[in-house]
Amino acid sequence: MRILVGTPTYNGQLTTQYTGSLLALRSELGDQVDWKTTSGTLLAWARNTLASLVLESDHSHLLFIDSDIDYPPSLIRRMIDFDAPMVAAVYPHRVLDVQRFHAMARAHDDPAAAWARSLSFVMELETPPVERNGFYRARYAGTGLMLIKREVFETLRDTCPDLYRPAAGSYYGHQGLKHVLQCFEPQYDEAGLAMSEDVSFCRRWQQAGGELWVVFDDTVGHVGPFTFRARA
């Protein structure tokens, strides 16, 4: 097993929470982990680059960890041991619904419980729920903390040949790639609206016959800015 930790960044910026988690993960997994970042504003291009690097290397897995995510390394070990081709850890949106938090605070005496119940999460489970060893099958999940086996990219390359192109002369060629698998390019929903790169990726994998599993019984942080604004 050899895992490439892939992290898209904006101008190379990483949060301290991300860095602390990555150091702990390296301590847990040792030399089984390599690390690669990208820098830019287009997430689909960044994720395409990292996926394509796996195909042009001997890595068995790609572990997406976004630069604003923190997590316990034991969670990554659980995801590895679950041994599914694609598994994601669920994290909250970086949004505070003040009205919902106010309602939850009135319903719960524990402030932490009120806070947790006021958040929304980046996933949609299948209905009815399908569970295995504490993991649930999902329609989609965010790719901010997602473990993907090499076979997923090989399958998408073979079943979607229009997505696999020579990289020469492109952004991807400048990243050192010979070919690029553009599996994160946005798809369009039934209304003709572009979907996010992570939802599009999940849908492509499921259209190829794959499954997505998620775990949400561990604590994952999604770091973001918050402006404290008021009059004293």
Say what each PLM segment does.
Residues L43-R47, L119, D198:
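Conserved donor sugar-nucleotide recognition element shared by glycan-biosynthetic enzymes
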Residues N48-H61:
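Active-site nucleotide-sugar/metal-binding loop of Leloir-type enzymes
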Residues D58-D70:
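Short beta-strand-to-loop acidic/aromatic patch adjacent to the donor-nucleotide binding site
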Residues K36-S39, V90, F216:
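Residue-level recognition of beta-strand->loop/alpha-helix junctions
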Residues H61, P85-M86, L212:
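Short, Asp-centered acidic motifs that coordinate Mg2+ and/or phosphate
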